[in-house]
């Protein structure tokens, strides 16, 4: 069995995927690199096959009809032989020194008595034109030791475990029934959210591992693109609302974190609907909040009466301007767009 499987969802990625693949190859025989060609129209499939030929036993090319990012991740989970699993998008990469430290620690943890469910490391926003890179650290978590939710501190606003920071135990992803929707953007939020109640033991290493590239005009986190795909953001938001009755999550720290995560996703949905400026999207905003209210009145009041919820729901044009100002401030803090 391999120690760590990397899945690289790849769609028309010929211009940048090799940088990603090359950053993962130093893992050698400890790792498995699954390049999932999601029905690409360019040379992505050819490049994937070329690396499979060059690095047999390490790189595998998987070809499928286009199913979107979520189905590419699903294919990775289905085909993974590693004890642990990580998604690396084809325009991102990893830092060599942090990578070597993580592999060494995973080897140690794999041979221990405690089953590790989730490994967390920092990620860096590699934003074009920005000299000082924002690093997402997790100061509320114990460092360099296995811990449980009981030992975790409270996450600050703007501190979220994203796909970029997490390595899951592969079997946990299968056992929790994770199946991401096809042809849908923003499913990475479901990827990190759904397994959380199944996570018992975690480990955090304060190293800047994952390099998250931001800057392509067609990127899904580009604000203009997000507004154009707002129906998919709302779909993901509703799936997350439906997934759990958060009031039944027994561990208070896990419950608090999951409320915060659902809150920021709902804030992003709401503010994109406001920023679009169309009456149709303002109606979708009202419908989203009605959906939450009809689904769980306590959840509605919890989200609505928080600082973010209040800022997002101030009435009239003046209220919408304040909402946008609050969003711009949170954007600088969180760096989610």
Regions found by a protein language model. Name each.
Residues 275-337:
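Membrane-interface aromatic/basic loop that binds lipid-linked glycans or pyrophosphate carriers
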Residues 23, 37-46, 68:
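A conserved acidic beta->alpha catalytic loop
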């Amino acid at each position: 069995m391999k120690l760590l499987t990397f899945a690289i969802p790849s769609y028309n990625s010929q211009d940048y995927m090799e940088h990603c693949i090359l950053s993962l190859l130093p893992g050698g025989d400890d790792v498995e690199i699954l390049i999932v060609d999601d029905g690409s129209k360019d040379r992505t499939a050819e490049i994937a096959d070329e690396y499979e030929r060059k690095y047999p036993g390490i790189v595998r090319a998987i070809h499928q009809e286009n199913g979107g990012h979520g189905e590419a991740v699903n294919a990775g989970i289905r085909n993974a032989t590693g004890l642990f699993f990580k998604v690396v998008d084809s325009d991102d990469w990893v830092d060599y020194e942090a990578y070597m430290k993580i592999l060494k620690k995973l080897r140690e943890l794999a041979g221990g008595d405690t089953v590790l469910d989730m490994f967390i490391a920092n990620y860096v926003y590699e934003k074009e034109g920005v000299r000082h890179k924002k690093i997402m650290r997790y100061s509320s978590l114990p460092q360099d030791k296995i811990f449980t939710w009981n030992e975790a501190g409270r996450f600050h606003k703007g501190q979220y475990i994203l796909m970029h920071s997490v390595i899951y135990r592969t079997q946990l992803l299968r056992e929790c029934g994770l199946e991401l929707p096809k042809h849908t953007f923003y499913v990475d939020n479901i990827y990190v959210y759904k397994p959380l109640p199944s996570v018992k033991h975690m480990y955090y290493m304060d190293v800047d591992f994952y390099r998250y590239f931001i800057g392509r005009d067609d990127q899904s986190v580009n604000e203009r693109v997000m507004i154009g795909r707002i129906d998919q953001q709302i779909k993901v938001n509703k799936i997350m609302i439906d997934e759990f009755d958060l009031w039944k999550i027994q561990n208070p720290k896990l419950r608090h974190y999951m409320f915060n995560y659902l809150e920021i996703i709902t804030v992003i949905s709401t503010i994109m609907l406001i920023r679009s400026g169309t009456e149709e999207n303002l109606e979708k905003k009202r419908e989203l909040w009605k959906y939450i209210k009809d689904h769980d009145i306590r959840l509605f009041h919890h989200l609505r009466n928080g600082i973010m919820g209040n800022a997002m729901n101030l009435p009239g044009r003046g209220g919408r301007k304040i909402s946008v100002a609050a969003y711009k401030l949170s954007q600088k803090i969180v760096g989610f767009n």
